UniProtKB/Swiss-Prot annotation:
Residues engaged in binding a divalent metal cation: H60, H62, H104, E106
Protein name per Swiss-Prot or TrEMBL: Putative quercetin 2,3-dioxygenase PA3240
InterPro entries: Pirin, Pirin_C_dom, Pirin_N_dom, RmlC-like_jellyroll, RmlC_Cupin_sf
Function recorded in the entry: Putative quercetin 2,3-dioxygenase.
């Protein structure tokens, strides 16, 4: 008998403002971050109004985790203290490992038009929180994409995609949390059953349309809702009218999570050290 992953929780994000006043939806991020371990935060930006994004994210620090920015529409410029410069374009990805520390800015390269995309924060294990920082800019043409026999369009940002018929290695593979990150576009009547490792935390965020998680107790996920699933079993998705959904899966770290603004460590003492290091100019070296 097939065992399916159960929907444990449905979650709705809330309006938020970050950077110099950028308006966004904070899908996850806040109290009880252990529920989403190893994922710390997911922000969605989706606006046609330049006033919502034009101020951008001026220079600011990070320590202790990774950020993944995935752009659907619009253009965003990254610059950091290491001398990295990158222009995020539609379909592109930026994977930044803050680790010991990075100081960077993310500023829009446009004053009109749509700005749509996501930023995901992925935790690092304690042993790697003070490793050297890193940055990778992945051009749209270097992000693997495929279409299944059933007409589902798949963007494989991280990890390995396998639905039993098609396989594809993503743009990024990370050993710490073994993240899988897909953007799926299901047509009307579309179905897909991506294979994900048992033991991985699985999150689904539907950002267009709606879909159903199949199983003994099918659950429909509406637009702009996130589902947290059980860590074992098969995943089967279908959409009657069509949908776009982010699939996030990662190996939980099961370590203490202490966050203060842009710093994510394992203890209050480590947060205080990060604040001192930033004040003394040695956070990002």
């Amino acid at each position: 008998m097939t065992r399916y992953r159960d929907v444990l929780e449905l979650h709705t994000g809330h309006p938020a403002s970050d950077g110099a006043g950028v308006r966004l939806t904070r899908v996850i991020g806040g109290p009880s971050p252990e529920r989403f371990d190893p994922f710390l935060m997911l922000d969605q930006f989706d606006t046609q109004n330049p006033d919502d994004y034009v101020a951008g994210f001026p220079s600011h620090p990070h320590r202790g985790f990774e950020t993944v920015t995935y752009m659907l529409e619009g253009r965003m410029r990254h610059e950091d203290h290491l001398g990295n410069r990158g222009l995020l374009k539609p379909g592109g990805v930026q994977w930044m490992t803050a680790a010991h520390g990075i100081i960077h800015s993310e500023m829009p390269e446009q004053v009109e038009g749509a700005m749509r995309g996501f930023q995901l924060w992925v935790n690092l294990p304690a042993k790697n929180k003070l490793a050297p920082a890193g940055y990778r800019d992945i051009e749209p043409e270097d992000v693997p994409r495929l279409e299944t026999a059933g007409g589902v369009k798949v963007t494989v940002i991280a990890g390995r995609f396998d639905d039993g018929q098609a396989q594809q290695i993503g743009a990024v593979e990370r050993p710490d949390t073994e993240p899988h990150y897909y953007d799926l576009q299901l047509p009307a009547g579309g179905r897909i059953a991506p294979r994900l490792p048992d033991g991985h935390r699985v999150l689904l965020y539907v950002y267009e349309g709606s879909l159903t998680v199949e199983g003994e107790r099918p659950v429909e996920i509406a637009t702009n809702r996130l589902a947290r699933l059980s860590e074992e079993g098969e995943l089967s998705l279908r959409s009657e009218a069509g949908a776009r959904v982010l699939v996030l899966a990662g190996k939980p770290l099961h370590e203490p999570i202490v966050q203060y603004g842009p710093f994510v460590m394992n203890s209050r003492e480590e947060i205080e050290q990060a604040l001192r290091d930033y004040r003394d100019g040695v956070l990002a070296v």
